[in-house]
Swiss-Prot record:
Family of the protein in this entry: Belongs to the ycf15 family.
Protein name: Putative uncharacterized protein ycf15
Name of the coding gene: ycf15-A
Species annotation: Helianthus annuus (Common sunflower)
Subcellular location: Plastid, Chloroplast
Keywords tagged on the record: Chloroplast, Plastid
GO cellular component: a single term: chloroplast
Domain of life from the UniProt record: Eukaryota
């Protein structure tokens, strides 16, 4: 029983580390892409919304 719990705990720690690493990577990539995505949107805020038929 103890051995199983220890293995599960170890896997859980590794899983958390990988999730944390993935989260930091996605934050870095999104912060890099953010200016490009937000740029056009900010410019279009003052303009009236275009109606697509």
């Amino acid at each position: 029983m103890r051995v199983q719990l220890h293995c599960i705990a170890r896997i859980h720690v590794v899983y958390l580390k990988e999730v944390d690493l993935l989260a930091s990577l996605t934050v870095q990539s999104s912060s890099r892409r953010a200016p490009f995505l937000l740029g056009p949107q900010r410019q279009n805020v003052g303009l009236p919304p275009t109606v697509h038929h």
